[in-house]
Amino acid sequence: MAGHSKWAQIKRKKAANDLKRGKLISKHLRAIQAAARAGGSPYPEANVQLRNAIEAARADDVPMENIERLLQKLQGGGEGAEQYEEIVYEGYAPGGVALLVYALTDNRNRTASEVRHVFSKHGGSLGTTGSVAWQFERRGVVVCENTEAAQEAAIELGALDLEEEGENLTVYTEPTEAYRIAEALKAKGVRVEAVEVVQHPQNTVALPPEEAQKVMRLVEALEDLDDVQHVYTNLDPESLQVEA
């Protein structure tokens, strides 16, 4: 029976991993579809936002055949492709930490119900439109290799701020400039790891580590929802660091 139990555990773990992988692929495909719409073209060569969405999907090992199948549908007028709309939910986590939740959904009622349930289960509260959005500002973020040449190029191209994180350099830009700067960095031979437009907190909230963990459990539960693409928070990252 012990052997049977061991294999049952492995099977359950594999099933859980397969489910998580399936969700990741689905989220990337939705992001590709949204990028095609937002960037104005279903053709990657004419849409830098779409190209970057595809690159992000490939970095997470989304099968190229899945991507190509979706692109063919979009390039054929979208027939057969799911129609998603972006919805933003605003609310508070325990400790008064603000959350912005971005979802792509084909069913508003289902998504709202799931998001509300997660907030309630983890001690948060779902707010109304505008209740926390004012605490964030849109920023472009380009993550690239951290070299002196990359730093000089980023400044020359109009970066708002630079943040060194080991081998990576995070370049903050105006939201409308992120993709232009990323492409210009690539043209200068700089290796770009990621580019996106995010909601950046204007101020952060510091909490004791145990309270910060409650916030992160809420964030992770929201991110596990199929329809949720991004969760932004104004929790101070240092709140998650436990002193040795």
From Swiss-Prot:
InterPro entries: Integrase-like_N, TACO1_YebC-like_2nd/3rd_dom, TACO1_YebC_N, Transcrip_reg_TACO1-like, Transcrip_reg_TACO1-like_dom3, YebC-like. It comes from Thermus thermophilus (strain ATCC 27634 / DSM 579 / HB8). GO terms for cellular component: cytosol. It is found in: Cytoplasm. Pfam families: TACO1_YebC_N, Transcrip_reg. NCBIfam families: PRK00110.1, PRK12378.1, YebC/PmpR family DNA-binding transcriptional regulator. Belongs to the TACO1 family. This is Probable transcriptional regulatory protein TTHA0821. The keyword Transcription applies. Keywords: Cytoplasm, DNA-binding, Transcription, Transcription regulation. GO terms for molecular function: DNA binding. Its main location: cytoplasm. One of its GO terms (biological process) is regulation of DNA-templated transcription.
